[in-house]
Amino acid sequence: MAESSKVVHVRNVGHEISENDLLQLFQPFGVITKLVMLRAKNQALLQMQDVSSAVSALQFFTNVQPTIRGRNVYVQFSSHQELTTIEQNIHGREDEPNRILLVTIHHMLYPITVDVLHQVFSPYGFVEKLVTFQKSAGFQALIQYQVQQCAASARTALQGRNIYDGCCQLDIQFSNLEELQVNYNNDRSRDYTNPNLPAEQKGRSSHPCYGDTGVAYPQMANTSAIAAAFGGGLPPGITGTNDRCTVLVSNLNADSIDEDKLFNLFSLYGNIVRIKLLRNKPDHALVQMGDGFQAELAVHFLKGAMLFGKRLEVNFSKHPNITPGTDSHDYVNSNLNRFNRNAAKNYRYCCSPTKMIHLSTLPQDVTEEEVMNHVQEHGAVVNTKVFEMNGKKQALVQFENEEEAAEALVCKHATSLGGSIIRISFSQLQTI
């Protein structure tokens, strides 16, 4: 164990955790004199008034797991005995004002274009240039104002705010760049001082230092490009090299499952070609995905998922495809396949089943009560929220556990609510 210190090192500090959250966690143990947020590392350094206060805090948290906003954080003594101004400058993020802002967008449930960002940031001054890109930190943008004061005003007003209700949270820093270079005017980069730039982009970012890819989402067809949709790399355990398109699903609840319910679940990870329930093994099914990468996503995210009281086994099949026939259901031309247009943005939302489902294409006059009544037969609804984005009604519904949410999704996706055929997917939000 590190030597006792009045400086506490806190890890796993997510972007949703604020300075006030940390202060509230440690204030019962004494006076806090300094706090440095290390946003790039998801860490923080917190200095108590004396060593005994820090010791009391760490002794308490040895037996009690500290949690902030549903996230476990981990505490230990820092190697620093005291936080100095120099150390804060080294560890803290760059705060020297500049007319260029670096914006990271967290909880990005919906695609963000330069037009959306321009609408958000232009009220604070003339935006000269704007570039978006993917990095390991997530979806980011560089926004260049005409004058520094406008950038400072935008940062003060927008830091921590959401572009859309409940998601797309802005984390804003001053960039150390002096000038943005923009080569193309399209939905990923824009030079508002030069409207005559071409729109075509040749698979490179507008500036090689900005991001790993500038390829348009509809063009993403290879593993490296798809990786960008996940924030710069594929999820742990995903190789992107699988070429087997068919998966074998076993331990199904034969009394509750059918082809359409399997389609509703597996179509979250790719386009479905065919599904076949094995009549001689009623708790088994074959699902043929659009390609090997989509099949790999399905195996990765659904293996071990609970559905209708059964824990699913999902593995690659020895069969390369499902032969068309009366005993298989064909979905190749279904308009309910989710990856036909803007496919890559859908990869970004792939995840294991969660407690939260997202409903879209809802009727404009839908109420929270109507949404809850539509799905509550599948489990205990903890919370419901109806909101509007781009003039269209959507909703989030939180269940007590992942199995209930999965049952609601497989049973109610593509059903009618108020005359509208609704779409349902898992949301990665933790709470509403």
Curated annotation (Swiss-Prot):
The lineage of its organism: Eukaryota, Viridiplantae, Streptophyta, Embryophyta, Tracheophyta. GO terms for cellular component: cytoplasm; nucleus; P-body. Its main location: nucleus. GO terms for biological process: mRNA processing; regulation of RNA splicing; regulation of translation; RNA splicing. GO terms for molecular function: mRNA binding. PROSITE patterns: RRM (PS50102). Residues 6-80, 98-187, 245-319, 355-429 form the RRM domain. InterPro entries: Nucleotide-bd_a/b_plait_sf, PTBP1-like_RRM2, PTBPH3_RRM1, PTBPH3_RRM2, PTBPH3_RRM3, RBD_domain_sf, RRM_dom. This is Polypyrimidine tract-binding protein homolog 3. Transmembrane segments: none annotated. Disulfide bonds: none annotated. Plays a role in pre-mRNA splicing. Binds to the polypyrimidine tract of introns. May promote the binding of U2 snRNP to pre-mRNA. It comes from the Eukaryota. Pfam families: RRM_1, RRM_5, RRM_8. Gene3D superfamilies: 3.30.70.330. Keywords: mRNA processing, mRNA splicing, Nucleus, Repeat, RNA-binding.
